[in-house]
């Protein structure tokens, strides 16, 4: 039976992750080519930002920043799409999480701030934590001429990491080079029972980093 590392070794490993995290750099907008870039917003909807069982102050805190970044993208002709939880009453996900973001309710709608930042956002509904598994999303990305993807939103250790890793893996599978960028300041996780948000978020970012995702502090 394999045993977990002893505490001192774990703390040594964690120190390395912490130092990496605190050394994150800021990406300059000039380093992004607008015509080949797609901004993907994950779950910045009322049910995670403003109301409902899974709304949280952590996600609310990035709402305006993502709205501002979305407006910046529009000004640079960078296309933005959004993924939004749209569950049915019999969603099996409710065996893990409280009932949330039912299709057709205000919880599944983008926040007003983000909707107002760009009136041309295409919204894709999703019924799981991995939006890339929705056929319409994967097909849209595959048929686009984009090879740089900036992912913002929530939750970093759930929907964001799953989407980012699956996107990267799909491009790798097809031998198509791509750049996947996740800005820390434009992502957040939430507080749930038996969930340590700061640790979960940091480790999610580190796992993405070790799998070829570009983690930056912000894009300024």
Predicted regions and their residues:
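Solvent-exposed loop/turn segments at secondary-structure junctions
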Residues: 47, 87-90, 156-157
């Amino acid at each position: 039976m394999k045993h977990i590392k002893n505490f001192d070794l774990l703390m040594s490993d964690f120190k390395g992750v912490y130092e990496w995290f605190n050394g994150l750099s800021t990406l300059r907008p000039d380093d992004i080519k607008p015509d080949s870039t797609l901004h993907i917003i994950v779950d910045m909807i009322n049910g995670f930002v403003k109301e409902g069982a899974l709304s949280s102050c952590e996600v609310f805190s990035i709402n305006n920043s993502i709205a501002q970044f979305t407006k910046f993208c529009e000004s640079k002709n960078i296309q933005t799409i959004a993924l939004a939880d749209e569950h049915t009453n019999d969603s099996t996900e409710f065996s893990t999480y409280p009932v949330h973001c039912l299709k057709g309710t205000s919880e599944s709608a983008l926040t007003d701030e983000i909707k107002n930042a760009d009136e041309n956002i295409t919204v894709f509904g999703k019924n799981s934590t991995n939006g890339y598994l929705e056929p319409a999303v994967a097909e849209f990305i595959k048929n686009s001429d984009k090879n740089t993807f900036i992912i913002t939103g929530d939750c970093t250790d759930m929907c964001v990491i799953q989407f980012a890793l699956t996107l990267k893996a799909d491009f790798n599978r097809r031998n198509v080079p791509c750049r996947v960028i996740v800005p820390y300041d434009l992502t957040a996780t939430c507080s749930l029972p038996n969930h340590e948000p700061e640790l979960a978020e940091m480790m999610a970012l580190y796992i993405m980093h070790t799998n070829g995702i570009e983690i930056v502090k912000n894009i300024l």
